[in-house]
Amino acid sequence: MSNNALDRLINKQKPKVPPRNDVVSESVSNDIKTQGQQELNTSLPPSDTKATPEEMPTSHESETSLSQDQKPKLSPDTFETVRNTIRIESEVDESLRQLCHEERITKETWLEAAYLYLCEKPEELAQVIQLAQERLSQRKAIADYKRAKTMQERFL
């Protein structure tokens, strides 16, 4: 029976499908590109003008924002992102998620902004690095404990 089913699977013919024609004429694609670029230009404020207070987002951290001269310039042509997966303590994750939800930002943009802010403040950056090193050693100790516990359960 299994040989018969295997033979049927091997000999099964795939349906014939006509090849797709995905080629778009060059003039249409150029029109779409220029239209998209025009929409981007109209939606983004000019980089040499500064935003008025009405345009600035209201936030609890407005006093600690980056200076206008030090703000990174984001342009659609050079903007690249990298996908990362990070492990965060569940309580910290929940509190950060709540903060980001209230402020209507993402964890990624919060992390970027915090890093850029700390780069301007070397003393605070040193404190954060010290705290991060302490948390890393705690995590390593917990991982060692869990590993030893698992090994003990396997051998006993």
Curated annotation (Swiss-Prot):
Region entry Required for interaction with McdA:DNA complex, spans? 1-55
Organism of derivation: Gloeothece citriformis (strain PCC 7424)
Q: How does it assemble?
A: Homodimerizes; may exist in higher order oligomers in solution. Forms a complex with McdA:DNA. Homohexamerizes, interacts with shell components of the carboxysome.
Which InterPro entries does the annotation name? Answer: McdB
Please tell me one Gene Ontology term that the record gives under cellular component.
carboxysome
Descriptive protein name: Maintenance of carboxysome distribution protein B
> Does the record's keyword annotation contain Phosphoprotein?
no
The entry's function note states: McdA and McdB together mediate carboxysome (Cb) spacing, size, ultrastructure and probably inheritance in the cell, together they prevent Cb aggregation. McdA is an ATPase that forms dynamic gradients on the nucleoid in response to adapter protein McdB, which associates with carboxysomes. The interplay between McdA gradients on the nucleoid and McdB-bound carboxysomes result in the equal spacing of Cbs along the cell length. Stimulates the ATPase activity of McdA, causing McdA to be released from DNA. Undergoes liquid-liquid phase separation.
- The ranges of region (Disordered) come to 1-79
Which biological process terms from the Gene Ontology are attached to this UniProt entry? carbon fixation
Residue ranges, compositional bias (Polar residues):
24-50
User: Where is the protein found, in the record's own terms?
Assistant: Carboxysome
User: Which keywords accompany this UniProt record?
Assistant: Bacterial microcompartment, Carbon dioxide fixation, Carboxysome, Coiled coil, Plasmid
Q: What does the further note read?
A: A type 1 McdB protein.
Q: Where does this protein chiefly localize?
A: other
Q: Which residues form a coiled coil?
A: 122-156
Q: Where is the composition biased (Basic and acidic residues)?
A: 51-63
